């Protein structure tokens, strides 16, 4: 290869570098490579580990070890010095070698820090190879390991180091703990399972195929990284599809998830919790015309079980019947049952859409990803999933502030517990449940300062109700009534009840779910043109309505003493009017920390993510290993510690790879 050809390549690279320099300066960014010595903290005590010879992903080489000669390159290692300089001569000679028979054979020397590489020796080799689009550059690498801290990025990096031991892959660099486990679960691999060379090649090829499709969306990396986008995509589609989809098909599926990817990466920043029912009664005719509000709606309900086997489904079906009474011929209502898993739910949801559904309520939290998949494939249909804290902008989620009703039944329990001991049977350690336990405990403490709440869980081994009663506890709070029907309170398997001296169970009161009120609110809002989603909107909307909206209620027993009944009614009125806050008081946790000094309440996000218990509660939140297998899926989906739960395997190890080799 002639020197003149190499010189022509240098001049081309120089023009690219000059253009990049101008663009970066115009954007107010540094036009030069990053300098590792400037990034590392002063008095740096990070350890250094020899990694050895690595095929470094070219795009991960972002800087130099020291500041010397950085002005010779742009941030992407394009040259900046004149073509007659000594620097240019060396660059041209390297270029000629690369284009000739010998090639560039010597590996570069560099440092790796938090997944990025900084060149100590071989800057011009990087410049030449990147100019010709080399996807990987061989280098001898030393890794700088930062001290382990609570910072999510550092925790994720420590997970990366374990991931690298098995995979020898640098192409994915997650920023959030738990993401490597999620990726391995999608691939059907164990965390310590060594990757074969064919597996590395396959993953590299598929990841870069996905990255190219994602890059076309031009999402800023500070919002979403390609590997973060891949995780959400893999929640909906199997890994092997990356080897089967055309470029156009892949780009379409990725583009449909754009805003969900942004919302899912931002997590809590992207979740908007709406605690009030919108008043749509005052929408003007002009507003309704502009919003193109419909005159008729086809509404579908998709349930994980059926009314004969699930009181939860029965409650939602009663909510559907409420819609029929309120809207009459303006709505067409259909129900679909036994969507027992996400896989079984997908064709059922598709059938609902094929039947003309314009609004689909999916009443089971474990079906949230099936809901999302349907939503991105049918963007004109409105999808809602009965769950909380889901960071997806394509769907809306809904649940009730049941803790408000628990506060009232707690006050009743405190007044009725003659021995000051009260049993509480909780369902799952999921978002909002600790708030309900604490609200109940605070209510009991209000009427009985000596009250102690003995906590049990129905999602672990044992017989909590029998155990509590056998232990001498006479007042017990159990699961909430699924509907307003009085029979659930009388059963004494729901709500709060008392065992008298004869061993009879006497009902006291129960929280109730009034799903019809929520469904009426949503449908009325759509009729009034209140359902809006702007293009490019990456906010996830979670409805979390309470007693002031009528979605949550309390049924009181006629057997309550008159004074207790009257006091419960006062509390109920205060919560319905929005003037009473169960948590606006001094609160101390089990470990002695003061969670509130009484001058403020808690924000909805704080209540949903509450992971501590009040100091008058005896008991603890179970670990994931203690939870019964039948209950684990719910906890994976909505658990207060879901980000720390080991990833669930999706098939046998290597199954996905074996299928596509």
Question: Language model features by range: what are they?
Answer:
Residues 356-365, 384-386, 472-482, 505-513:
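Periplasmic-binding protein-like
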Residues 398-420, 512-532:
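Hydrophobic alpha-helical segments within soluble ligand-binding/sensing domains
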Residues 103-118, 123-156:
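A short, basic-hydrophobic beta/loop patch
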Residues 298-318, 323, 336-342, 432-434:
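Extracytoplasmic "Venus flytrap"
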Residues 529-660:
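Segments of small-molecule ligand-sensing domains
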Residues 1-120, 130-131, 176-188, 215-280:
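Short, charged/polar connector segments at secondary-structure boundaries
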